[in-house]
Curated annotation (Swiss-Prot):
Binds directly to 23S ribosomal RNA and is necessary for the in vitro assembly process of the 50S ribosomal subunit. It is not involved in the protein synthesizing functions of that subunit. It comes from Moorella thermoacetica (strain ATCC 39073 / JCM 9320). One of its GO terms (cellular component) is ribosome. This is Large ribosomal subunit protein bL20. CDD domains: Ribosomal_L20. One of its GO terms (molecular function) is structural constituent of ribosome. Belongs to the bacterial ribosomal protein bL20 family. GO terms for biological process: ribosomal large subunit assembly; translation. InterPro entries: Ribosomal_bL20, RIBOSOMAL_L20_CS, Ribosomal_protein_bL20_C.
Length: 121
């Protein structure tokens, strides 16, 4: 069999990794081995944090809902329980958006939850 020389293939592979490492500090953007190690780590972090981002947004929505609910004299837990008992199916993303942008609508939902829990509107 003929001997396979890797000159062109290796050069293309190195170029691809160094392109991904553009903007990194020091040797991590200039030399292949440190750049390759950092690119592998960076891609792993990106993969993990794309999944973590879902939970981060959920936490943000809950914090916003809780803050708006407490301004109306009820906490997050009771609000969600009251809405569930009232049969109001609204997700946390929409509820948080209402708390920020449509306070009148959010206040109406709080009143519905309070009625269902018997806390008085």
């Amino acid at each position: 069999m003929a001997r396979v020389k890797r000159g062109v293939t290796k050069h293309q592979r190195h170029k691809k990794i160094l392109k991904l490492a553009k903007g990194y500090f020091g040797a991590k953007s200039k030399l292949f081995r440190p750049a390759n190690e950092q690119v592998i780590k960076s891609l792993a972090y990106a993969y993990a944090h794309r999944r973590q981002r879902k939970g981060d947004f959920r936490k943000l929505w809950i914090a916003r809902i809780n803050a708006a609910a407490r301004m109306n004299g009820i906490n997050y837990s009771r609000l969600v329980n009251g809405l569930k008992k009232a049969g109001v199916e609204i997700n946390r993303k929409m509820l948080a958006d209402m708390a920020v942008n449509d306070q009148a609508g959010f206040n109406r939902l709080v009143d519905i939850a309070k009625e269902k829990l018997g806390l008085g509107a």
